Curated annotation (Swiss-Prot):
Keyword annotations of the record: Cell inner membrane, Cell membrane, Ion transport, Manganese, Membrane, Transmembrane, Transmembrane helix, Transport
Single GO biological process annotation from the record: intracellular manganese ion homeostasis
Protein name: Putative manganese efflux pump MntP
Subcellular locations according to the entry: Cell inner membrane
Function summary: Probably functions as a manganese efflux pump.
């Protein structure tokens, strides 16, 4: 898998966290230091969860290698549809919090937005990809997107939160479809 495909996956995976960051930014005014710390927590968690998913997928691979492209397609496509539905309906993660959110609550919120990345990690186990590089790209993209989301949230949270979720879902469906079609020899 090439760099640009990984970058698209990373941006797609960061959309959940971006949507939450927009909402947090709209609800709580944070100093730059707190924005940086929160973004790093989200990025770290988002980088670790695809590694965990990849390990599970890697060990399951010998048992389902004949269907691996279908597994990636179904996981990424299903996750993409879920994100699009949430983007349209507004069922995104709950962002209730106190003004002095603890590190523990930040980690839990980050984990809640990164469950999808674990599923992507399972799908990546069935593709030719350097998982450490992929996890690093996902983590960096999430760190940047959360920092941007928290900063811009006060003005843009209500307007773009749902659109970001929907766009992330579209990206995942496109990557899953590309994986399936390329494995079937329909595209290169």
């Amino acid at each position: 898998m090439g760099f640009y495909a990984l970058l698209l996956i990373a941006l797609g995976m960061s959309m959940d966290a971006f949507a939450v960051a927009l909402a947090k930014g709209a609800a709580v005014r944070m100093p730059p230091r707190k924005i940086a710390a929160t973004a790093l927590v989200f990025g770290t968690v988002e980088a670790l969860t695809p590694l965990a998913g990849w390990v599970g997928g890697f060990y399951a691979k010998p048992f389902i290698s004949e269907w691996d492209h279908w597994v990636a397609f179904v996981l990424l496509g299903g996750l993409g549809l879920k994100m699009m539905r949430e983007g349209l309906s507004g069922e995104a993660e709950d962002v209730r919090e106190s003004k002095r959110e603890s590190l523990w609550m930040t980690v839990l919120t980050a984990f809640g937005t990164s469950i999808d990345s674990m599923i992507v990690g399972v799908g990546l186990a069935f593709m030719e990809v350097n998982i450490a590089f992929a996890a690093a790209i996902i983590g960096m993209a999430t760190t940047v997107m959360v920092a941007v989301g928290l900063t811009a949230g006060r003005a843009l949270g209500v307007l773009f939160g749902r659109c970001a979720e929907f766009a992330g879902g579209l990206v995942l469906i496109a990557i899953g479809t590309w994986t399936l079609l390329s494995h079937l020899g329909l595209i290169q």
